[in-house]
């Protein structure tokens, strides 16, 4: 009889967002007239930028002409896209990243999970708490953890609490860890990291031969010029960090699918015989074997992000969502709630009122004002008693949701 990967049985019954959908769908079925406003899953609502749409239409026409038709593309991504990314996203900020070190993919969610395939199972792994669930669940799936305790914490992971007491920036561990997940601007708390803070992590990683997985999916929302957009703006990061980025939240590619991972050629890991191995070569081998590349049409759309028109249009999109975040933050603060994030990030992190648990607040919001958010406990034990509200929605819906919430839950 065929056996299964028993690690999957360690996972919680439902991934956070499908569980939210299940509850919302059940409520909607029982209350068909309810006008539900969804501020939960971080999915964008505004259309693709015109520059991207125009480029993709042209790319479709290319595919209809024998002279410009494209078949299989390079697994790493077309050079014309990688070169623009290297120049505008990294080199323009003083980060010494070459186009050859960039890998185009169909999503940073996929990459943050797949990257584990090039690392051994004997690494000690650190995650923040609360944390984007994908980081934890993918480690469980590949066998890097033991079982979960009553709080949902898995044996074999080092949890680094991020709370209001430490400004939602995890303290560097006193013991040695091998792989470290950092996400800034942070999902779910909306916190940001200073250069000094990231430098401390880079120094720690260098001293301990550790690797940092740096998720910069929300870097476009940084408006403070003192906050770094990339970990490679920090001296020495090329030797210790892999960075993940996405076109989902800046250009609205959640349904179009395009992202990138940066693996510097100066980054190495240890083989079983103690020798140093270039991680770039391992990731390139993995991608060449298991991935056929992002479609030509989508990559042309992503390339248009770097045009003058594209840059102006994505800045407009980001500004729109940041204004939504500002409205959420200000309205909830005025209602007496404790509110964090939402300044250089599209997420607002709210302390639940009146001692309610995260899921109790979720159910109360859904049932009494028909607004959906994300329970903080779904991101980890330290998220209990908090709630994430997303700025990804129409202005009308955001304003209406705040009107409903503040009327019902004014402290």
From Swiss-Prot:
SUPFAM superfamilies for the chain: PLP-dependent transferases
Residues at which pyridoxal 5'-phosphate binds: 72, 108-109, 132, 187, 218, 246-248, 257, 292
Pfam families per the UniProt record, alphabetical: Aminotran_1_2
EC number(s) stated in the UniProt entry for this protein: 2.6.1.83
GO molecular function: L,L-diaminopimelate aminotransferase activity; pyridoxal phosphate binding
UniProt-listed Gene3D superfamilies: Aspartate Aminotransferase, domain 1, Type I PLP-dependent aspartate aminotransferase-like (Major domain)
Cofactor: pyridoxal 5'-phosphate
CDD domains assigned to the protein according to its UniProt record, in alphabetical order: AAT_like
Protein task: Involved in the synthesis of meso-diaminopimelate (m-DAP or DL-DAP), required for both lysine and peptidoglycan biosynthesis. Catalyzes the direct conversion of tetrahydrodipicolinate to LL-diaminopimelate.
Family designation: Belongs to the class-I pyridoxal-phosphate-dependent aminotransferase family. LL-diaminopimelate aminotransferase subfamily.
Name of protein: LL-diaminopimelate aminotransferase
Organism: Nostoc punctiforme (strain ATCC 29133 / PCC 73102)
Underlying gene: dapL
């Amino acid at each position: 009889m065929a056996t299964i990967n028993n690690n999957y049985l360690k996972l919680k019954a439902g991934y956070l967002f499908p569980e939210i959908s299940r509850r919302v769908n059940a409520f909607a079925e029982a209350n068909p007239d309810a006008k539900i406003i969804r501020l939960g899953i971080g999915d964008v609502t505004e259309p693709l930028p015109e520059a991207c749409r125009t480029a993709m239409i042209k790319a479709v026409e290319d595919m209809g002409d024998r002279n410009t038709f494209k078949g299989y593309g390079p697994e790493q991504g077309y050079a014309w896209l990688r070169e623009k990314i290297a120049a505008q996203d990294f080199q323009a900020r003083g980060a010494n990243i070459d186009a050859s070190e960039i890998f185009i993919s169909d999503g940073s969610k996929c990459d943050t999970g797949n990257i584990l395939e090039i690392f051994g199972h004997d690494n000690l792994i650190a995650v923040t708490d609360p944390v984007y669930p994908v980081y934890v669940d993918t480690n469980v799936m590949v066998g890097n953890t033991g079982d979960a305790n009553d709080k949902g914490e898995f044996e074999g992971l080092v949890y680094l609490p991020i709370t209001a007491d430490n400004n939602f920036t995890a303290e560097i561990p006193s013991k040695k860890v091998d792989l470290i997940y950092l996400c800034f601007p942070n999902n779910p708390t909306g916190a940001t990291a200073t250069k000094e803070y990231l430098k401390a992590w880079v120094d720690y990683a260098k001293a301990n031969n550790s690797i940092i997985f740096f998720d910069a999916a929300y870097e476009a929302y940084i408006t403070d010029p003192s906050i770094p957009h990339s970990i490679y703006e920090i001296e020495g990061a090329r030797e210790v960090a892999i960075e993940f980025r996405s076109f989902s939240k800046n250009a609205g590619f959640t349904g179009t699918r395009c992202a990138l991972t940066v693996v510097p050629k100066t980054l190495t890991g240890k083989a079983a015989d103690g020798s140093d191995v270039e991680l770039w070569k391992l990731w390139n081998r993995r991608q060449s074997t298991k991935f056929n590349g992002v479609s030509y049409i989508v990559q042309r759309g992503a390339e248009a992000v770097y045009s003058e028109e594209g840059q102006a249009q994505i800045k407009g999109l980001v500004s729109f969502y940041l204004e939504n975040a500002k409205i959420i933050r200000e309205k909830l603060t005025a209602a007496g709630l404790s509110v964090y994030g939402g300044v250089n990030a599209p997420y607002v992190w709210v302390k639940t009122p009146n001692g309610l648990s995260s899921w109790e607040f979720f159910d109360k919001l859904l049932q009494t004002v028909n607004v959906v958010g994300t329970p903080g406990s779904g991101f980890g034990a330290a998220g209990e008693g908090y709630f994430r509200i997303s700025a990804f929605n129409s202005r009308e819906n955001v304003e209406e949701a705040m009107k409903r919430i503040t009327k019902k839950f004014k402290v």
